[in-house]
Design a protein with these regions (language model features):
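Extended redox/cofactor-interaction regions of prokaryotic respiratory oxidoreductases
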Residues: 2-7, 182-270, 295, 405-522, ...
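N-terminal export/assembly segments and adjacent metallocofactor-ligating motifs
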Residues: 2-309, 335, 460, 468, ...
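A glycine-rich phosphate-binding loop feature that marks nucleotide/adenosyl-phosphate handling sites
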Residues: 168-169, 317-320, 374, 417-427, ...
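Long, well-ordered, tryptophan-enriched scaffold segments
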Residues: 262, 273-377
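Short beta-alpha connecting loops at secondary-structure transitions
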Residues: 282-288, 548-559
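Active-site phosphate/pyrophosphate-binding segments
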Residues: 333-334, 338-454
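Phosphate/diphosphate-binding loops
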Residues: 507-508, 555-574
Length: 814
């Protein structure tokens, strides 16, 4: 029956101010950029027109994707079918209490993922070349037998180090269904029962910042909770865009807004793109060339040092290597940070605002003004998102940005921050144990294609192999569970295609997924997984400010088609591999959940009973300390609470990095340095390649997708079109108008997509939202707007991570 939309709904007016205000704050950010308003009104009207039946059930479920949030979904089910989706209805919008955990446009469209035409229906095996997407249907028994037989053969011939668990975050929030890190998955538990597997370290989101700030603070760098901004006088965000990357669930973007309303803190955004985090709520946007954040910081530091705006007492007491007083004896003369900034170090170049301006594109007078504001305003919440670190010089850039918080003594205090991304409170909920991996070898998550191509050549000193001096064998089998990094989310797709097409190299690829993704098309055996709506699990929060929560993700509907849960699949494989008892310990999936929940109640006594929690749907608890303050104990007593760095202090100069720089084998242009210096890295604005490819291409997390997840949902694609963002000045030079089809290209590939001509991009820079589904034609020209056709597989120097935002391209009108 056709639903008639009331004219009054379509005629309703929304003020520009009201629309902009709503955009990023409430997680409905799709409205602000090219979403036609009748779209949302029609959707609402259609939902309202759905009749309520007496047998309707409302069942708690969750969206468990890798967006930094985990959201409860209240599924309305009639006759075994999901009719519509609502979100959390417990609590209110006051972030001082147990507030609602509201799903965004993505989670609310979960029904369209469950019933998507792309759903995998039954097990299949490849019959064409890898990547062609040609498969034939097989039984589950045949699929299990093929996998078990071939895996045993490969282990016997090459050893367990030849079996690799690929990076996948499609169901990150689950307890039983968790897909990352690989060591915490049910596939890992299965492999650990069978002798282990080749592990990976790092991740595509934060490899460089995790490695870089490890040498500054020791371990993962913590940050203050966003709620603590209510104590701040100034907020400075480097490439941090919670308005899109943290727009739902724990609501980091809403914490930011409510906290600023209390503190009236000025907010300055430093980013090549004017993001939804701004959207009229920022006080200043400073556009900057990608990959030059460290140069900007150095220029700021020059002003702070020469105008006596640094916190000398803090630097003397808590830090190593700021000046001669705290420089390690092993360091060279004038090897300290102050000497480097003032031009008294080995390069002899003073890092003046004028010097920084030439590199960054930020005017020198603006650098001076910003330095004085940061140096004279305290406390200041200085943070960086994960955009600046996803570069060829990402590790060293993260250390540089953190220097602003260190120089001003904003670390370990209310209203301040460490210079890292915001932190949050978490609950000690128990997840599925996965046993110990007997294989100690690991590689960077970004270098698995190299491990297929030249595994035995990869060494610790040249390629970052950990656990041994070198790899002994290449990767011969890949498990790809709930991930699209086999193709779509991995850099330089055309190179990956060439490597994977040769099935004599990697002999077996098993893909477990819900949809026919780009990666699924490269499977040898393809297994259909259940969605979160088709099984029972617990979902845990991620970035959630100072209120943590757990969601009871109940089974909403029966598994569709022949889909099975990951626990069913791995249990059946364990049976064929002779390790069933060790793997299952005699428990079903629900029995494991009850077992884990009982353990969690011991750690969190406030949790209700299992059955009460099932009805309740969500458990929330606020941080008993109020706001989370990173390194507070260290600040209060550094001797009693040292950091995990070698010195126990904040290491501005890192002797460990000096040792690595002296011993590792690096390609020309790669730099590892004991100080947070500026180094351009490859394919920078200053690279000679700029003459051929004059535009810098950067990526961003688009609000309609979580990486590639939800990238096949029609209404989200219509609401938030995939476009290449380009400044009017660059567009005019090329005769490009808004909406024109353009070709973006370099030596690695070519993408055809529409142009979005907007002053929200810095001149000389273009941007593509990452995660769009790869859609090549016969000549391998991508028509889907997938940025990884253009990115490089050359890793960053220290973390060996993905430099996804370091790209030079040319753009032409088609």
């Amino acid at each position: 029956m056709k639903t008639k939309i009331p004219d009054a709904v379509l005629a309703a007016e929304v003020s520009r101010r009201g629309l902009v205000k709503t955009t990023a704050i409430g997680g409905l950010a799709m409205a602000s950029s090219a979403l036609t308003l009748p779209f949302s009104r029609i959707a609402h009207a259609v939902d309202s027109a759905i009749p309520t039946k007496s047998d309707e059930k409302v069942i708690w479920s969750a969206c468990t994707v890798n967006c930094g949030s985990r959201c409860p979904l209240r599924m309305h089910v009639v006759d075994g079918e999901i009719k519509y989706v609502e979100t959390d209805n417990t609590g209110d919008d006051n972030y001082d209490g147990l507030h609602q955990v509201r799903a965004c446009l993505r989670g609310r469209s979960m029904r369209r993922r469950v019933y998507n035409p792309d759903r995998l229906k039954y097990p299949m095996k490849r019959v064409g070349a890898r990547g062609e997407g040609k498969f034939e249907r097989i039984s589950w028994e045949e699929a299990y037998d093929i996998i078990a037989t071939n895996m045993q053969r490969l282990i016997k011939e090459y050893g367990n180090e030849s079996i690799y668990l690929n990076y996948g975050t499609g169901t990150l929030g689950g307890t039983m269904t968790r897909s990352w890190p690989p060591g915490n998955t049910l596939v890992a538990r299965l492999m650990n029962c069978c002798g282990g597997y080749l592990n990976h370290y790092g991740d595509y989101s934060s490899a460089q910042i995790a490695e870089g700030l490890n040498y500054t603070y020791g371990g993962w760098a913590d940050g203050n909770s966003p709620s603590d901004i209510e104590n701040s006088k100034l907020v400075v965000l480097f490439g941090n865009n919670p308005g899109e990357t943290r727009m739902s669930g724990g609501g980091v973007t809403y914490y930011l807004e409510q906290a600023r309303q209390k503190s009236n803190a000025r907010m300055i955004i430093i980013d090549p793109r004017y993001t939804d985090t701004g959207a009229g709520r920022e006080d200043e946007w400073i556009p900057i060339r990608p990959g030059t954040d460290a140069a900007l910081v150095n220029g700021l530091a020059y002003v702070m040092i020469t105008e006596n705006l640094v916190d000398q007492a803090f630097l003397d007491k808590y830090c190593v290597g700021y000046d001669e007083k705290t420089l390690p004896a092993s360091a060279p003369k004038n090897g300290h940070y102050k000497a480097y900034i003032l031009g008294e170090g080995p390069d002899g170049v003073a890092k003046t605002p004028e010097w920084a301006s030439q590199i960054t594109g930020v005017p020198a007078d603006k650098i001076i003004k910003l330095a004085r504001e940061i140096g004279s305003t305290k406390p200041a919440f200085i943070s960086q998102g994960w955009d600046p670190q996803r570069h060829a010089n990402g590790e060293i850039a993260t250390r540089a940005i953190s220097m602003l918080a260190i120089l001003t003594g904003n670390v370990g205090i209310n209203g301040g921050n460490s210079g890292a991304r915001e932190g949050s409170y978490s609950l000690p909920f128990v997840r599925m144990p996965t046993l110990e991996n007997p294989i100690q070898t690991s590689i960077s998550m970004f270098m698995w294609t190299d491990a297929i191509e030249r595994g035995p050549e990869m060494t610790a000193l040249r390629d970052g192999v950990r656990g041994k001096d070198k790899l002994d064998v290449p990767i011969k089998m890949i498990w790809n569970y709930a991930g699209n990094c086999l193709v779509n989310q991995h850099s330089e797709i055309n190179r990956t295609h060439e490597i994977l097409q040769d099935d004599k190299k990697c002999e077996l690829i098993v893909v477990i997924d819900c949809h026919m993704t780009s990666s699924a098309k490269y499977a040898d055996i393809l297994l259909p997984d259940c969605t979160a709506s088709e099984q029972m699990d617990f979902a845990l929060d991620a970035s959630c400010g100072n209120m943590s929560y757990v969601i009871f993700n109940d089974q909403v509907i029966k598994p569709r088609f022949e889909c099975k849960t990951i626990y069913e699949m791995t249990s059946e494989l364990a049976k064929r591999l002779g390790v069933e008892q060790q793997f299952t310990e005699g428990r079903t999936q629900e029995e494991w959940m009850r077992h884990l929940y009982a353990q969690s109640r011991e750690a969190i006594p406030e949790l209700p009973t299992f059955e009460e929690f099932r009805k309740q749907g969500i458990f929330k608890k606020r941080d008993p300390q109020g706001h989370h303050v990173a390194y507070k104990a260290f600040r209060e007593d550094p001797q009693a609470n040292p950091l995990t760095t070698p010195s126990g202090k904040i290491e501005i100069y890192s002797q460990a990095l000096a040792d690595i720089a002296a011993t590792w084998e690096l390609p020309e242009g790669d730099v590892i340095d004991p100080l947070p210096i500026y180094t351009p890295g490859f394919e920078s604005y200053q690279d000679p390649l700029n003459k051929q490819y004059p535009l810098q291409l950067t990526g961003f997390h688009y609000k309609s997708r979580v990486h590639s997840t939800y990238g096949n949902v029609d209404v989200l694609k219509a609401a938030c079109r995939q476009e290449m963002w380009i400044n009017p000045l660059d567009a005019q030079k090329r005769g490009i108008n808004n909406g024109d089809k353009v070709r973006i290209f370099n030596d690695r590939g070519e993408v055809h997509i529409e142009a979005k001509v907007t002053p929200r991009m810095m001149p000389g820079v273009v941007a593509l939202g990452e995660g769009a589904w790869y859609d090549p034609d016969a000549k391998r020209v991508d028509k889907g707007g997938c940025i990884n056709v253009l990115t490089t597989q050359r890793p960053s120097p220290l973390a060996k991570g993905n430099p996804s935002h370091t790209n030079l391209v040319q753009v032409e009108k088609v």
